[in-house]
């Protein structure tokens, strides 16, 4: 099955070479890290993005401390990362099971750490509308606790997961970091407050941070049960099993879908940059393109149907979700210029890798 989908994909899609200067910059940083071991803290380490960060950093010979309360993270993600690595590299990982809403956990985790990659949060716009108190507790109190703990531990850099939801009702495309609208959900409010707190900590305490506004990140270890940008894994599972798919709205809603390897790259570049002008900034993390839900379905259907011979056609349309924006597309010129970011995967390459991972899970 996997060999079939690989041959189909690569006949039509060839990955572009990494000859540009931005990609060379990232390659140099990874090469340098292998021989220059640092201590990293990843909050939300058992989550989708957190576990991908863990895999990359351990593979680069780094020491990693991880924090997770397993409310949305999954121990299976950590087990999968362990299966990909040598026992020597895996021994560089220490897990602290705890919650970032507990300041004691945060201070313990930050001890002797060089870089913090703060991913822990309660994601999902619908969840925040249903339970704004829990979202506020995790995303604002937890964030503030981590800022205090990182400040007191004198970490070199605090990198955190911001969100494209911060753009709110601002309609103009592409989205540029310095122009935002009114938040459309409690989740969006919490992520904007994170940016405000990070800025205040720089002004008040001289603490350096970088915020990364993720645009619909997807990829391996994002399951159909994931609360964050769940449309892709839900649809993959449904198409594979020839089950019904629901499209919110008329199918023309569009997103700047960003494969998880691009998000990992952004975190590493942000943590290690020596460009002083790049510090204490907010950056879009995306590919600078957008795909409608209807086109996303067609792409996934094309990838999966040719492998399973299911010819999926069970599609139904329903109302728009509360709090959702109509269109989203990022301007990535700022992160490209200041952090030398260059996406390794666009939508087609990312979907191929994601579908391949899902097929491995169901074999």
What are these regions (language model features)?
Residues 173, 224-233:
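A glycine/serine/threonine-rich, flexible loop-to-helix segment
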Residues 193, 197, 201, 231, ...:
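Hydrophobic alpha-helix immediately C-terminal to the catalytic Tyr-X-X-X-Lys motif of short-chain
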Residues 24, 33, 40, 59, ...:
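C-terminal substrate-binding subdomain of Rossmann-fold SDR/epimerase-dehydratase oxidoreductases
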Residues 145, 222-223, 253-255:
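Heptad-repeat alpha-helical coiled-coil signaling segments
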Residues 1-217, 267, 271, 341, ...:
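N-terminal Rossmann-like NAD(P)+-binding domain of SDR-like oxidoreductases, especially those catalyzing
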Residues 73, 101, 130, 138-141, ...:
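Residue-level signal for the nucleotide or nucleotide-sugar donor/cofactor binding architecture
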